[in-house]
Amino acid sequence: MTKENRKRIIAVDYGTKRIGLAKTDPLQLFAQPVGTFSEEALFRAIKEISGLDGIGRILIGYPLNADGSHNRMTDIVDAFAARVHNEFPDIPLELVNEHGSSRSAGQILINSGLSRKKRHEKGRLDSASACVLLQAHLDKSH
């Protein structure tokens, strides 16, 4: 495996209140949650991951409707993606359809056996949604 391949892939689930972040393991086999952040704290977290592990790609969940059409959040995420690209111009950025990721993440949290109270803690669903996006990308790639 080349050094380039060992860089982490990260996924971002953008929300107007909280932003979920996930990253791969060093072999890019599994997604793991990093946490939930404000936008400013997210940029710091990405810089930290980049400095420690390197980042080979940034995935951003793209909020499309079931029919593939744009919605109110699409423009907001477009603006956010532009800021990410400006801040990290050397890291490839990819928008990935996030339709259904929150629902899938919610089901995973239910199946994990977490209590309802734990499942509804602020940010848990956001970071789980980022993991779902990232794991789906990894599963397609392998």
From Swiss-Prot:
<keyword id="KW-0378">Hydrolase</keyword>
<dbReference type="Pfam" id="PF03652">
    <property type="entry name" value="RuvX"/>
</dbReference>
<dbReference type="InterPro" id="IPR012337">
    <property type="entry name" value="RNaseH-like_sf"/>
</dbReference>
<keyword id="KW-0963">Cytoplasm</keyword>
<protein>
    <recommendedName>
        <fullName>Putative pre-16S rRNA nuclease</fullName>
        <ecNumber>3.1.-.-</ecNumber>
    </recommendedName>
</protein>
<dbReference type="GO" id="GO:0005829">
    <property type="term" value="C:cytosol"/>
</dbReference>
<dbReference type="GO" id="GO:0004518">
    <property type="term" value="F:nuclease activity"/>
</dbReference>
<dbReference type="InterPro" id="IPR005227">
    <property type="entry name" value="YqgF"/>
</dbReference>
<comment type="function">
    <text>Could be a nuclease involved in processing of the 5'-end of pre-16S rRNA.</text>
</comment>
<comment type="similarity">
    <text>Belongs to the YqgF nuclease family.</text>
</comment>
<dbReference type="GO" id="GO:0000967">
    <property type="term" value="P:rRNA 5'-end processing"/>
</dbReference>
<dbReference type="InterPro" id="IPR006641">
    <property type="entry name" value="YqgF/RNaseH-like_dom"/>
</dbReference>
<dbReference type="InterPro" id="IPR037027">
    <property type="entry name" value="YqgF/RNaseH-like_dom_sf"/>
</dbReference>
<keyword id="KW-0540">Nuclease</keyword>
<keyword id="KW-0690">Ribosome biogenesis</keyword>
